[in-house]
A protein has these predicted regions:
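N-lobe entry segment of adenylate-forming
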Residues: 1-61, 66, 83, 109
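Active-site-adjacent beta-strand anchor residues
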Residues: 7, 71-72, 117
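Proline- and acidic/polar-enriched loop/turn elements at helix boundaries
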Residues: 33, 69, 97, 118-120
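Short, flexible active-site loop motifs that bind/organize anionic cofactors or intermediates
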Residues: 37, 44, 94, 113, ...
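Conserved AMP-binding/adenylate-forming
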Residues: 40-41, 55-101
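Residue-level recognition of oxygen-bearing side chains
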Residues: 46, 53, 77, 112, ...
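Alpha-helical structural signal in soluble globular domains
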Residues: 84-88, 126-133
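Conserved ATP-dependent adenylate/AMP-binding module captured primarily in the ANL superfamily
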Residues: 99-130
């Protein structure tokens, strides 16, 4: 016999994150950690604050429903950026850091992002000339 699972109504990943954050007894408990040296740890509270702060900045620069191109390696800041984009009411367009120039050109021309978030100067250099056009 199948049991019905009772699930609280969560509308999206942002709500799920903040609900989990509320339920944390120790907000300083480590949530995310980078793998590269020097290692950086992010507590639930730091992550929450970073998401809110970046989201507020994104809202100043964009309109609800705009696309945001996110070019980053798999790292804690990717998670923070993605949830910030969603919280700001934007659409995340994720891109691999290993794409060729023509791939970035296609994505940028196709999605027409209002803003681009990159993980470092190396990633920025890959797309800056495309963005100028």
């Amino acid at each position: 016999m199948k049991k019905n699972l009772e699930v609280n109504k969560i509308n999206n990943l942002v709500e799920l994150f903040f609900k989990q954050c509320e339920n944390q007894f120790d907000k300083n408990k480590i949530l995310l950690s980078s793998l590269k040296e020097p290692r950086k740890n992010f507590s639930w509270q730091e992550t929450s604050n970073s998401i809110i702060k970046l989201s507020e900045e994104l809202k100043k620069l964009t309109n609800k429903g705009d696309r945001c191109l996110l070019i980053s390696e798999n790292r804690p800041e990717w998670f923070i950026s993605d949830l910030s984009i969603m919280l700001a009411g934007l659409i995340t367009v994720p891109a691999y850091t290993t794409y060729a120039q023509k791939d970035y050109e296609y994505i940028i021309n196709d999605c027409s992002p209002s803003i681009v978030i990159v993980s470092n100067i190396e990633q920025f250099n890959k797309v800056k000339n495309i963005l100028k056009n």
